[in-house]
Amino acid sequence: MRIRTVLSAAFVGLLAIPAQSRAADPICGDVNTSGTVTTADALSVLKRAVGQPVALQCPAAATPLESGQSECFNEGGDVINCAGTGQDAALKKGVPATYTDNGNGTITDETTGLTWEKLSEDGSIHDEGNVYTWSEALDRVDTLNSQSFAGHNDWRLPNIVEARTLLNFDTFSPAVAPEFDSNCGTGCTVLTCNCIQPDWYWTSTTYQETNEDAWFVDMYNGYTDSTTKTEQNFARAVRGGL
């Protein structure tokens, strides 16, 4: 039996916003020379720091994305006054995601730098109703690349961190920004709409304890869990960014 893992809105704080490379810094810099300081760099720094008596003078972490929450709640789920709760709506921390429709079937999050495939209701490969096993979702991305969708051939299935940047915890069904649930209707194309199912979307991230499972993000309410790779879920491609 799977143990369900529910990640709170605070997980958004782990999302990296593109930062300037600090390759010149031998301790806190771009350790893996990816062009930005990433989680992988941070892990490398921590490993090297073990046993060192001196304090590391590392730059401050990048500002996290805001969760989107505008109301506070008690344990029973009732809306309460935010004063003194320490909840996201009270603190109002982070920066908002801002989106640009590129007019070619894609939409770019200017905050993270991620460019997302828009989804349609026209029966095409972009149709929001298409479902895939995990391997089929990867094959779908290969097809988009072979077709040079929107002029690019570097599309991929988003990892768990990238997929969670779509979430807006101020709403549900779907728990996303309105830019990802706009103008949907029978026959609409990626040039005229951007659709989403309030359901499970695959990520490329394999579950650590077993290669037979992978992580998904539930666009209904924002929780994250893993499931068998043979299950059929929805998919959306991404490129660039983090």
Locate predicted features:
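Alpha-helical segments with a strong preference for the paired helices of cellulosomal dockerin domains
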Residues: 23-25, 31-59, 164, 168
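Bacterial N-terminal signal peptides that target proteins for export
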Residues: 1-9
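Generic anion/oxyanion-binding catalytic loop in active/binding sites
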Residues: 12, 31-34, 126, 226
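Glycine-aromatic-enriched surface loops/turns that form tight recognition elements
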Residues: 60-156, 160-242
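Bacterial N-terminal signal peptides
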Residues: 8-16
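Sec/Tat signal peptide C-region and signal peptidase I cleavage site
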Residues: 17-23
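Intrinsically disordered, low-complexity regions enriched in serine, threonine, proline
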Residues: 1, 19, 233-236
